[in-house]
């Protein structure tokens, strides 16, 4: 069947396209560099023609609170309207574990706004909540660095590989709509400070990881279970300590 992947040229999108194509589906990447812009609506009608499923793994180019909210509200609204006209039967969106829980965080608030639009749409849907990706480990460490030290809260942390994310999103996309949320996570649960201490040691990174209960995650405070599933989740197969990309230098 024809499955359109919004954000299909990015980290998860490209893996998802490969996964779906290997299963024999017509997987079509849709992104600004393929002529599809969900913010303006450009190219949506054409790319959605004949599509059975749409998977949205797109992301905002800006993480400033107002900009990211505008991105998800506008792009999701345009996408859902175009899907309804095209007769799409299943909308799948990738979101974040813990997005709906306090404390409120700008990016998470924007993702919940996106989910609310999806839930109110007449199109059958599935929302996949994923934990943080292995591929973002260096970026998260860099964002948490001040004065040469990486400050991390000792909260629970259960990241997963992008390949596992793509595999699970593909599974959901090729199944029946759940009209609700599905949670996915990595196979191992850590304390966040311990995870990053081990990661930086493996990189021979000289930065000290400081355990700081008041450390923020991209500007927002964390509670012990903010970043992990609270109930049953489908677990990935890749362990970080044996993941092939663990020691790769950032591009």
Q: What is the role of each PLM region?
A:
Residues 125-126, 139-160, 164, 183:
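A conserved pocket-lining segment of Rossmann-fold NAD(P)-dependent short-chain dehydrogenase/reductase
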Residues 196-251:
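Mobile cap/lid helix-loop segments that border enzyme active or cofactor-binding sites
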Residues 22-86, 96-106:
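NAD(P)H-binding glycine-rich loop region in Rossmannoid oxidoreductase-like domains
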Residues 54, 165-169, 184, 192-195, ...:
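Non-catalytic, hydrophobic alpha-helical segments
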Residues 135-141, 146-147, 172-182, 205-207:
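Glycine/proline-rich active-site loop of Rossmann-fold NAD(P)-dependent oxidoreductases
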Residues 6, 69-73, 103-112, 155-163, ...:
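Short-chain dehydrogenase/reductase
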Residues 1-23:
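N-terminal Rossmann NAD(P)H-binding glycine-rich loop of SDR-like oxidoreductase domains
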Residues 87-90, 95, 116-136:
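Conserved beta-loop-beta element that borders a ligand/cofactor-binding pocket
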